[in-house]
Amino acid sequence: MAEKFISDNGAKVHDRIRISTDAKTYEGFLLPRHNFSGEDIVVLKLDNGYNIGVSVEDAELAILSKAKKDKVEFTKKKKNKELKDITVLATGGTIASFVDYKTGAVSPAITAEQLVNSVSALDKVANIDAEPLFSLASEDMAPKHWEGIAKKAKEIHDKKQHGIVIGHGTDTMAYSAAALSFQLPEISNPVIFTGAQRSPDRPSSDAHLNLVGAAKAAMTDLGEIAIAMHQTTDDENVALWRGTRVRKAHSSRRDAFMSPNEGPLGLVKENVELKGKYRPTAKETKMESGFEDSIGMVWSHPGLGIGDWESITSRKKGVVIAGTGLGHVKSELLESIGKTAKDMPVAITTQCLSGSTNLNVYRNGRELLQKGVVETYDMLPETALVKMMWLSKHRADEVRELMGENLIGEISNSRKLG
């Protein structure tokens, strides 16, 4: 019905049209109908940036202007000698995406150059070199990609001495930030991850402020891997979160990230305000890249049985347990966990959003310690997994000793009681 209505009126996708109904008149650009559109619905991109579906029943259509067929090309911007140089690496994610109107879904498609050129405010912040690295949804990121990002970052630091902004999907950004933190323990210039909860083509997108904030942070003396994302739901400032102490805590809000047990490393408004203790940049970037993939993570829960534990751990070279509360697992699992701990490193952290493990409080916790399970205090589960993967590759004989030690700021509360 809608397709015939459009065809009969001679309209084509991206034409500017007016649709009038008995109730209201709408003007905007005609968008492709996606697979889930109703048969009587046409989709318009309004001037305010929002999309709207309009029923064609008893409606009239007028073509205001035909679609332009000119290809949009980005011109090379002149270098501003008064500004610093940074490199933006695009790896995919919502920040490098747009709404695919054939499906109604968000698809990674924007190039690194398009992303940078879409944020005009960047021209006043820094001279930008944009480089594509991957075009991946966050959930498709794997340890091999962490290694690729680290190698590229070191290459840029060695050749250009640029600060680096990495555009990344938000769902697994905390894993990637932790991974680079261990691979690049010393950096000569900042490495800042950023992303977006809403794609750049939406008027409510957080991509622009996050990218500008990350660019400003990339020109400081911050010698740690960090994440730059909205601190609140408004557009007032961007928070900088330590790469080993951050997790995504909300699935869709713009202020999605938090650092349990500690605040942000800094805030970005007009300027960057770094807070508290942080590592300054080093003379050169040091790298130990690579991970052991066969490390497992087990979340303790009421239904977890011995068979589940043995099935998960049978082909692994190390295991991280996300325990309940202070670091608890079921009593019936203690013997099986003890057997596993004789063959491979087993570490435990807490599922809780705040607080720390303390295996000295309850009997089960003390038994875990006696059986060789390593307590990791308030290390985040995501970080603990990445740390064991990295240690197993580079410090295989010291994993048990080092999992509970604070190497690069991954543990903020390392008290040992009892």
Predicted regions and their residues:
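Short Gly/Thr/Asp-enriched flexible loops that form oxyanion-binding sites at enzyme active sites
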Residues: I166-V191, V329-I337
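A glycine- and small-aliphatic-rich helix-loop capping segment at beta-alpha/alpha-beta transitions
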Residues: K102-T111, A178-I192, A207-G213, V246-A249, ...
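Internal gly/pro-rich beta-alpha loop/helix module
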Residues: Q197-K269
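Interaction/scaffold regions that mediate signaling and macromolecular assembly across diverse proteins
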Residues: A130, T357-A396
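Accessory alpha-helical/coil subdomains and C-terminal extensions
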Residues: L89-A90, D100, T111-A112, N117-L122, ...
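ATP/NTP phosphate-donor binding region
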Residues: K4-F5, N51-G53, E60-K154
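CN hydrolase (nitrilase-like) catalytic-core segments centered on the catalytic cysteine
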Residues: V320, T324-L359
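Conserved RNA-binding domains used in RNP assembly and mRNA/RNA metabolism
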Residues: M1-K81
